[in-house]
Amino acid sequence: MQFSIVYFLVFLIPSTQSTGFLSLKLTSDHDCLVHLEIQSMEYSETVRLLAYETKSLEIFTPEITNQLSIHFQILHHFSGVSLSDVSSQLFKLDNNGIWEPRVIDSDQVILSIQSNFHCQKGFYGPICERRSRSTSTIKTTTSIPTATSSPFHLPISEVQINNLIIYAVLSSVVLLLIIANCFLCFCRPKPSKYIDYTFQNVFPMDEFFPMEKTIGSPDTEYFDSSSRYYSTITLQSRV
């Protein structure tokens, strides 16, 4: 009878197991490689860190105890030579929303570690040991656009067409102004040039000086009778 009661209590009380994620933030003061290893989960990973660079990791913890042991080892960033001994760190899988800091101090590199544990979706409780059985229904509403629009808002297509019309009109006006300016610059009338052929003193020469020819005088004048208007040529000859 006592054995049956104990057997019943074992199946009635849930075991202390958790299902969630252990988040880690790693920061170092020098360039290095950090090698992580979890023997209970057959998990291993190597992370490259630059100086004062923070990298985040998430380790899935399915159905394990409320504590997790992780082995850390700091390596040289280029050669991979060990810069510290293997350090075993024990993390509590406590879903309290608090980041717990810790430091691994070696001779050459200081490694800062921040840890936080949070439950997987569908689990809750201090160590994520309880599974949620409630289901939530989400109502989604899809709005179908109608063809009618409010009188104060134009459809996007009409607004685009109106903008194109306005741009076309403005472009045409600017083009016409440019053509008109070019026409005025290259086709304006040139200033006229003329020669005044009027003579102030025009008179017939044969009315005052008849044709004559003087021989033997030092000055000989010849009169051109074919032209009656101011076409006298005077030649002087010296003997």
UniProtKB/Swiss-Prot annotation:
It comes from the Eukaryota. GO terms for biological process: mesendoderm development. Keywords: Developmental protein. This is Skn-1 dependent zygotic transcript 1 protein. May have a role in mesendoderm development during embryogenesis.
